[in-house]
């Protein structure tokens, strides 16, 4: 199993990354919580990974910290939660907020996440409550996202595309991004603010 990669960040187009490790390009999928803390393209980064082997593909999921990967692994063990939904949950809510929702039995907040209905929210609460007690405090490694001066039109399009990939409807994603003042924001910041408005 591939548990960790260290390499040069070649591409980042949420939710996909391309990481060059000693001349081999690894295609990775990552939650937006990881995108928020990635360095600029061309910089070296260490990512913790989870490999999923299917009949038709081998998929690598990347996380900024071991704790985040641990939460993802706990999520995909919940009945009805696959890797895509697990990434959506980590992208749509901070680990601390998710923990609070589970501990307090807050199905309303959980159902606001893309792909999470009432039954899935109830299952998450029941199955994750004990697992979260066994996990160390959640957190993300202390890396910072890159900043750009002025938001390019491609940045807005990338943000909308990332929200659609997370399960939001295209018109809903566009509407949420249009409501923001996107000037001088990175793609990750646009996505984060749009998600906060939609939740």
Swiss-Prot record:
**GO terms for CC?**
cytoplasm; Holliday junction helicase complex; Holliday junction resolvase complex
Q: Which residues lie within the region annotated Domain II?
A: 65-143
The UniProt keyword set, sorted, is: Cytoplasm, DNA damage, DNA recombination, DNA repair, DNA-binding
Q: Where is this region: Domain I?
A: 1-64
One record GO biological process:
DNA repair
The parts of the chain that form a coiled coil are none
Where is the region Domain III?
A: 151-199
Membrane spanning residue stretches: none
Annotated region (Flexible linker), positions in chain? 144-150
For whether the record's keyword set contains NAD, the answer is no
- UniProt GO molecular function: ATP binding; four-way junction DNA binding; four-way junction helicase activity
Subcellular compartments = Cytoplasm
UniProt xrefs under SUPFAM superfamilies: DNA helicase RuvA subunit, C-terminal domain, Nucleic acid-binding proteins, RuvA domain 2-like
What InterPro entries does UniProt report for this protein, alphabetically?
Answer: DNA_helicase_Holl-junc_RuvA_I, Hlx-hairpin-Hlx_DNA-bd_motif, NA-bd_OB-fold, RuvA, RuvA_2-like, RuvA_C, RuvA_C_sf
Q: What does this protein do?
A: The RuvA-RuvB-RuvC complex processes Holliday junction (HJ) DNA during genetic recombination and DNA repair, while the RuvA-RuvB complex plays an important role in the rescue of blocked DNA replication forks via replication fork reversal (RFR). RuvA specifically binds to HJ cruciform DNA, conferring on it an open structure. The RuvB hexamer acts as an ATP-dependent pump, pulling dsDNA into and through the RuvAB complex. HJ branch migration allows RuvC to scan DNA until it finds its consensus sequence, where it cleaves and resolves the cruciform DNA.
What family does this chain come from, according to its entry? Belongs to the RuvA family.
Instruction: Cite the HAMAP family for this sequence.
Output: DNA_HJ_migration_RuvA
What the entry lists under NCBIfam families is as follows: ruvA
Q: How does it assemble?
A: Homotetramer. Forms an RuvA(8)-RuvB(12)-Holliday junction (HJ) complex. HJ DNA is sandwiched between 2 RuvA tetramers; dsDNA enters through RuvA and exits via RuvB. An RuvB hexamer assembles on each DNA strand where it exits the tetramer. Each RuvB hexamer is contacted by two RuvA subunits (via domain III) on 2 adjacent RuvB subunits; this complex drives branch migration. In the full resolvosome a probable DNA-RuvA(4)-RuvB(12)-RuvC(2) complex forms which resolves the HJ.
**Record remark: domains:** Has three domains with a flexible linker between the domains II and III and assumes an 'L' shape. Domain III is highly mobile and contacts RuvB.
Q: What is this protein called?
A: Holliday junction branch migration complex subunit RuvA
Q: Which organism is it from?
A: Nitrosococcus oceani (strain ATCC 19707 / BCRC 17464 / JCM 30415 / NCIMB 11848 / C-107)
Name of the gene: ruvA
């Amino acid at each position: 199993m591939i548990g960790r990669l260290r390499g040069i960040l070649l591409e980042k187009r949420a939710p996909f990354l391309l990481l060059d490790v000693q001349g081999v390009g690894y295609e990775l999928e990552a939650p937006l919580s990881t995108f928020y803390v990635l360095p600029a393209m061309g910089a070296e980064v260490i990512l913790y990974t989870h490999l999923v082997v299917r009949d038709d593909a081998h998929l690598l999921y990347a996380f900024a910290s071991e704790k985040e990967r641990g939460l993802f692994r706990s999520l995909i063990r919940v009945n009805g939660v696959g890797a895509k939904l697990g990434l959506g949950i980590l992208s749509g809510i901070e680990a601390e907020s998710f923990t609070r929702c589970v501990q307090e039995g807050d199905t309303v907040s959980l159902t606001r996440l893309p792909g999470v209905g009432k039954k899935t929210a109830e299952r998450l609460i029941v199955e994750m409550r004990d697992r979260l007690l066994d996990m160390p405090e959640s957190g993300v490694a202390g890396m910072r996202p890159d900043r750009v001066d002025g938001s390019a039109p491609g940045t807005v399009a990338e943000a909308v595309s990332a929200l659609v990939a997370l399960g939001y409807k295209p018109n809903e994603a566009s509407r949420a991004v249009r409501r923001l003042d996107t000037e001088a924001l990175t793609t990750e910041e646009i996505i984060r603010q749009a998600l906060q408005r939609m939740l």
